[in-house]
């Protein structure tokens, strides 16, 4: 007979010592085949090591639950965070209480020990495809397929794969298997693939991928053969709808049971519960009142953690939108409404701007000079033209040379 696990034997030994006062710790350890020192530690109230938090743990249970809830909310909005984002959430909560940041592998280990979270590779999701993935529309399509098979007596063996190009005999995509073979050639330093090498690789990939099991799995996964629409409909996202407010639901309101509140309505109910308990408190144990206050504090702390994460998200969004706002506010000058653009049309706004700057410098007095001397007039170093810089003159000559060469051509 297989003996129970070590932890179960330890619990039985502690229970036996508690029930039988004459049973010594040494005898219980020998009877249940467990270490004597471990039983002594358990009798003094020490818990198992696996039940204790890690010594290097940075976040509390409430903070970790807040991060998990925030990740699930982001995933519900189709914006699941990366591991780097989860690490930033934890560091932001730690900065709120001046604690050191988490380690490099903290996010990976955090997701690993949370049963609600799992890492997946993201892929591009087309917006038009997402709009068509409506359970109602796809359910009607399955009904149409079933009606067509019943009307014309089509059996499962006569079902083929069609698309907008029809049935193309011999044209079957085997991308993953073919890609693996090409990778093997690349690792062998074969960078140029000829027709012969391609045909050999394609033949091997075709027979490796087009197996009976893969073909049947494709039709089974699509819910066609065997006919099972729920295999597809169950994977689609549930359409969002506005829930009914609790106050508008029929029936009598249930009395509030003390627990940790997570929204405004539950917070008000918990507060009313505490007020009622305090007003009816007369020479009774304050344990229930203290527990209710602790639950209210726990809920308020969780809300504060969520507010801190939201503030971090808003700050990052503002920082990302700041350059875009500057570009939108920038002044845009329309050079020409239509028609061909000539060199002179593009040069006239530049000349007017530079002449305006030169005239402004002439009218403004120089406060550093004696008697309010006028500022030095801006001239080009090449052609000595007033109000024109050397770079502008170079651009003018380049445009003229380009137009002349184009006309000669």
Swiss-Prot record:
Residues 243-269, 320-350 are annotated as: Disordered. Residues 84-113 bind DNA. SUPFAM superfamilies: Homeodomain-like. Transmembrane segments: none annotated. Part of the gene cluster that mediates the biosynthesis of chaetoglobosin A which has a unique inhibitory activity against actin polymerization in mammalian cells. Chaetoglobosin A and its intermediates are involved in the morphological differentiation of C.globosum. The first step of the pathway is the synthesis of prochaetoglobosin I via condensation of one acetyl-CoA, 8 malonyl-CoA, and a L-tryptophan molecule by the PKS-NRPS hybrid synthetase cheA, followed by reduction of backbone double bond to install desired geometry by the enoyl reductase cheB. Keywords: DNA-binding, Nucleus. Residues 51-120 form the HTH CENPB-type domain. Residues 255-269 have a biased composition (Polar residues). The keyword DNA-binding applies. This is Chaetoglobosin A biosynthesis cluster protein C. The keyword Protease does not apply. It comes from the Eukaryota. Pfam families: HTH_psq, HTH_Tnp_Tc5. Induction: Expression is positively regulated by the cluster-specific transcription factor cheR that binds directly to an asymmetric direct repeat present in the promoter. One of its GO terms (molecular function) is DNA binding. The lineage of its organism: Eukaryota, Fungi, Dikarya, Ascomycota, Pezizomycotina. Signal peptide: none annotated. It comes from Chaetomium globosum (strain ATCC 6205 / CBS 148.51 / DSM 1962 / NBRC 6347 / NRRL 1970) (Soil fungus). GO terms for cellular component: nucleus. It is found in: Nucleus. The gene is cheC.
């Amino acid at each position: 007979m297989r003996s129970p696990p070590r932890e179960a034997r330890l619990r039985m030994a502690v229970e036996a010592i508690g029930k039988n006062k004459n049973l010594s710790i040494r005898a219980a350890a020998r009877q249940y085949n467990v270490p004597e020192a471990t039983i002594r530690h358990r009798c003094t109230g020490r818990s198992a090591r696996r039940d204790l938090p890690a010594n290097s743990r940075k976040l509390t249970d409430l903070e970790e639950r807040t991060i998990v809830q925030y990740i699930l909310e982001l995933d519900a909005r189709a914006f699941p965070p990366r591991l780097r984002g989860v690490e930033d959430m934890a560091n932001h909560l730690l900065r709120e209480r001046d604690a050191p940041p988490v380690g490099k592998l903290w996010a990976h280990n955090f997701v690993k020990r949370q049963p609600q979270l799992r890492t997946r590779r993201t892929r591009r999701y087309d917006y038009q495809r997402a709009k068509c993935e409506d359970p109602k529309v796809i359910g009607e399509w399955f009904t149409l397929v079933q009606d067509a098979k019943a009307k014309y007596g089509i059996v499962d063996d006569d079902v083929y794969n069609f698309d907008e190009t029809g049935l193309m005999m011999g044209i079957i995509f085997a991308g993953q298997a073919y890609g693996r073979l090409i990778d093997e050639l690349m690792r062998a330093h074969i960078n140029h693939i000829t027709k012969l090498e391609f045909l050999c690789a394609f033949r091997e990939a075709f027979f490796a991928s087009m197996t009976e099991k893969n073909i049947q799995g494709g039709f089974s996964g699509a819910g066609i053969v065997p006919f099972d629409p729920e295999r597809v409909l169950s994977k689609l996202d549930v359409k969002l709808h506005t829930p009914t407010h609790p106050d508008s639901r029929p029936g009598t309101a249930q009395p509030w049971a003390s627990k940790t509140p997570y929204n405004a309505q539950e917070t008000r109910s918990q507060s009313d519960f505490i007020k009622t308990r305090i007003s009816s408190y007369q020479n009774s144990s304050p344990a229930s009142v203290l527990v209710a206050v602790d639950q209210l504090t726990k809920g308020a702390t969780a809300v504060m953690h969520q507010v801190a994460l939201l503030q971090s998200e808003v700050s990052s969004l503002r920082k990302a939108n700041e350059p875009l706002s500057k570009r939108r506010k920038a002044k845009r000058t329309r050079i020409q409404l239509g028609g061909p653009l000539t060199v002179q049309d593009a040069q006239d706004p530049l000349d007017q701007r530079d002449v305006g700057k030169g005239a402004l410098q002439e009218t403004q007095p120089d406060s550093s000079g004696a008697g309010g001397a006028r500022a030095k007039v801006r001239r080009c170093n090449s052609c000595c033209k007033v109000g024109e810089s050397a770079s502008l003159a170079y651009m003018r000559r380049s445009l003229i040379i380009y137009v002349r060469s184009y006309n000669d051509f």
